[in-house]
């Protein structure tokens, strides 16, 4: 088992069978000791965050499997903090796809002249480049196509999958009286036919969720959902 990548919140290992093993860490993204799913650096370490992220990821990926939504997930071992996944080809140097139900975070920083904090959004989907140096800039459908990162047809598939997946997560959270404000997803091409599938994770570390108007920390979110 060889280390192929050490990430902000996970390490990636290549397995002998050609699949990969993701090792979840207790680091979360943020700035100045404050959690922020949109941040480009590790902001703090939260004991138990890795296993909490994996428990939610396992829950949601298995839920998506029931809905026949393609993902890279194979299986997981929560006690060891590991998840076995299929190999995936990312788009360009990596894309992040955000689905927004309320105006917060970077949306407000960009559109605060027109938007109100917490304003309801209709599952607004936007794509950003994974580019720390340029602070993950948003990119349009046409630009993705013209730069050879994603075809127009692939963009439509990506957007449709994002809305479906985000809707499922939103519904699961609402069963616990929790409101999903936004969620960040990643996709890649998998298997011989290179179909688009969800990759990475779905956890408290890549979403903002609120209960009774109060923000829920990632570890608390896992406890509320899994209980």
Swiss-Prot record:
GO molecular function per UniProt: ATP binding; phosphoribosylaminoimidazolesuccinocarboxamide synthase activity
A Gene Ontology BP annotation from the UniProt entry: 'de novo' IMP biosynthetic process
Protein name: Phosphoribosylaminoimidazole-succinocarboxamide synthase
Record carries keyword Hydrolase: no
Pfam families hit by this protein: SAICAR_synt
Record's keyword terms, sorted: ATP-binding, Ligase, Nucleotide-binding, Purine biosynthesis
Organism the protein comes from: Clostridium tetani (strain Massachusetts / E88)
Functional pathway: Purine metabolism; IMP biosynthesis via de novo pathway; 5-amino-1-(5-phospho-D-ribosyl)imidazole-4-carboxamide from 5-amino-1-(5-phospho-D-ribosyl)imidazole-4-carboxylate: step 1/2
Catalytic activity: 5-amino-1-(5-phospho-D-ribosyl)imidazole-4-carboxylate + L-aspartate + ATP = (2S)-2-[5-amino-1-(5-phospho-beta-D-ribosyl)imidazole-4-carboxamido]succinate + ADP + phosphate + 2 H(+)
Lineage: Bacteria, Bacillati, Bacillota, Clostridia, Eubacteriales
Entry-linked HAMAP family: SAICAR_synth (MF_00137)
SUPFAM superfamilies for the chain: SAICAR synthase-like
EC number: 6.3.2.6
Family: Belongs to the SAICAR synthetase family.
């Amino acid at each position: 088992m060889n280390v192929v990548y050490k990430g902000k919140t996970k390490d990636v290992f290549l397995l002998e069978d050609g699949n990969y093993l993701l090792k979840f860490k207790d680091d979360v993204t943020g700035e100045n000791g404050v959690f922020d799913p949109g941040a480009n650096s590790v902001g703090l370490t939260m004991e138990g965050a890795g296993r909490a992220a994996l428990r939610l990821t396992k829950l949601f990926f298995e839920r998506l499997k029931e809905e026949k939504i393609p993902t890279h997930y194979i299986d997981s071992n929560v006690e060891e903090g590991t998840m076995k996944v299929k190999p995936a080809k990312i788009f360009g140097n990596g894309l992040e796809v955000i689905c927004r139900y309320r105006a917060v975070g970077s949306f407000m920083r960009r559109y605060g002249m027109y938007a109100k904090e917490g304003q309801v959004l209709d599952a607004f989907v936007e794509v950003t480049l994974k580019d720390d140096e340029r602070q993950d800039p948003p990119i349009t459908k046409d630009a993705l196509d013209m730069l050879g990162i994603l075809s127009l047809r692939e963009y439509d598939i990506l957007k449709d999958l994002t809305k479906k997946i985000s809707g499922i997560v939103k519904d699961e959270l609402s069963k616990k009286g929790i409101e999903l404000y936004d969620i960040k997803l990643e996709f890649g091409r998998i298997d011989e036919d290179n179909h688009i599938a969800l990759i990475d994770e779905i956890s408290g570390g890549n979403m903002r969720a609120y209960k009774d108007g109060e923000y829920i920390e990632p570890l608390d979110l896992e406890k509320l959902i899994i209980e």
